[in-house]
Amino acid sequence: MIDNRDTESSKNNHGISWNTRRNHAAWKLYLRDVEEDIPVYAVPALQTDYSGLPPAYTFVGDREVFNCETLKYIENLKAAGVPAQVDVYPTGLHAFDMLMPFRKISKEAIKKFEEAYVYAVEHYHT
């Protein structure tokens, strides 16, 4: 959850594990009654300056509720000069790697995530 505003992939999404209805409910619970001056720590997509943030790796399914906001977040990091990478998996819904770990795309996503973690520990951890 990066953006509390609807994106193209989050509106009218009927995914089985996470969807528009669940997303709206989660944001409502999380933000409570805060509607103005929402801290960027609560909603990272509201950030305007991404410089100085740590490198990032993530993956997302192309049918994922968070697809658009994830891609935009990585794009913003890169534009600020932050090393960032995202892998997009076809047919992937929210949490596909955990719900269907036996699928080829899940195994690939898990493997690449583990590789990115090891790389981060070796190159960025002090």
Task: Name what the model sees in each region.
Residues M1-T126:
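Alpha/beta-hydrolase superfamily serine-hydrolase fold, recognizing
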